[in-house]
């Protein structure tokens, strides 16, 4: 799959019809599972080897926010694009082995100084139960002025 080129028309269509849902699996094998040089320095809830807690190996914020970037890039071909601002809220832990369904809604489009901007709302769900996991609001420049 190659997404359509990022243009005002592409993002207007995404705003009207919605975008492609993407899925990602969180596990101890994921490259983001140990995002510190020393995994033992990570919070116990995020480590897979944490004996001091029964709840361990939960997805870290880097994975959650990356899901937002990945779905954004999966819906429109952008090169380059500039991630400007993010706000997010977690609703539930993403546990080891969870498949995460990610959906994006375009909330606003605007132009400033020749740059094309998009404000998007990204929602993460458990792919099986459809329980909400997190929400992300993101602002990005998807097309730099020529």
PLM-predicted stretches and their roles:
Residues 43-46, 65, 69, 139:
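Generic detector of well-ordered alpha-helical segments enriched in charged/polar residues
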Residues 1-56, 74, 143-146:
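Non-catalytic linker/capping segments at the edges of enzyme domains
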Residues 22-35, 82, 86-88, 100-102, ...:
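Generic preference for hydrophobic/aromatic residues in regular secondary structure cores
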Residues 18-19, 57, 68, 97, ...:
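Residue-identity detector for glycine
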Residues 1-12, 90-146:
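HotDog/MaoC-like acyl-thioester-processing domains
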Residues 61-106, 135:
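Hydrophobic beta-strand-centered segment that forms part of the acyl-chain substrate-binding groove
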